[in-house]
Structure formats: C-alpha cells, structure tokens
Design a protein with these regions (language model features):
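Multi-pass membrane proteins that catalyze or facilitate reactions on polyprenyl-/lipid-phosphate substrates
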Residues: 1-157
Length: 157
C-alpha cells in the first residue's frame, strides 16, 4: 500500500511539473530519492510520461475531431518538421545509455544548468527568430536531444 501511495505522489509530481519549463523527469528522480523508492533505470519516468501522453491525447482529441478540415495537419509541413525534429532525439536515445544519469547527484547539477539556460534564453529571446524549415527543425531536435537528460526541461529548451 505504501508503494501505491509513493507512485500516486510521483504521478502528481509528473502532472504538476510537465507543462512548466522545469524538468518533470528530474523532479521524479529527486522525489524517488526522497521517498526512498528503489527504481532501477527509468521505468517510473517512462510510465509517468506515457500517462502524460495519454492525457494530452484525450485533451486534444475533441479539438482535433471538431476541426473542419482534419487533413490540414497531415498535408502541411507540420508533420514533416515534427518528424525531422524527432530524429536527433531518437538517434541519441539509441546510441547513449541515459539510464546512468537517472540519479540524484546528476539531477541536482542538471537542474541548476537548466535554470541558467532558461535565464540566458529569456534574455536572448528577442535577439533571434527561427522560421520553420529543415534546418530549424533539426536544430530544435538537437536541443530536444539534450533534454533527454533528467533535469533538463524539454519546454525550457
């Protein structure tokens, strides 16, 4: 029963931190350490992220199906650029063993680095603009690859 309560707490942490420019994975790692949850690898994080994905799909299902032209998304460059931006993260995920970074010591430093990145990006936000093209989609994908690390925020990137 205690384990169930711990995982409910982790689910709440995931839900509260996913849509802010903080690392939900990093916070999950920290709270697993605080709650003394023995989790080998990233299984709890993966399950929590699938829960987030499921809730997002449910949330946006209504707006997608109420769209006047459902084919717009699939006939625009959006799907193409979304695929391009995913490629670097997939390659990094296949090449590197990220599970070694799911520990309290690494996360504390990556959360600190993430905070500095967010401050720097907020200062630079008006100095450049990206147009959606192959190069910018690939660049976005490279930054998202860095965000695979726990403690680095995907939305902060």
């Amino acid at each position: 029963m205690n384990e169930l309560i711990n995982f409910i707490i982790l689910g709440m942490i995931q839900g509260l931190t996913e849509f802010f420019p903080v690392s939900s994975s990093g916070h999950l790692v920290l709270f697993q350490d605080i709650l003394k949850i023995n989790n080998e690898g990233a299984s709890a994080e993966i399950i929590a992220h699938f829960g987030t994905l499921f809730s997002i799909l449910l949330f946006y299902k209504a707006s997608f199906f109420s769209s006047k032209n459902k084919n717009d998304f699939f006939h625009t460059n959006t799907l193409k650029f979304l695929t391009i931006s995913t490629i670097p993260a997939v390659i990094c995920g296949l090449i590197f063993d990220f599970e070694q970074f799911f520990n309290y010591q690494f996360v504390q430093y990556s959360l600190l680095a993430n905070g500095f990145l967010i401050i720097i990006m907020s200062l630079l936000k008006n100095s450049f603009s990206l147009k959606l093209n192959f190069k910018s989609a690939l660049l976005l994908g490279l930054f998202q690859s860095i965000a695979i690390l726990p403690g680095i925020s995907r939305s902060g990137m």
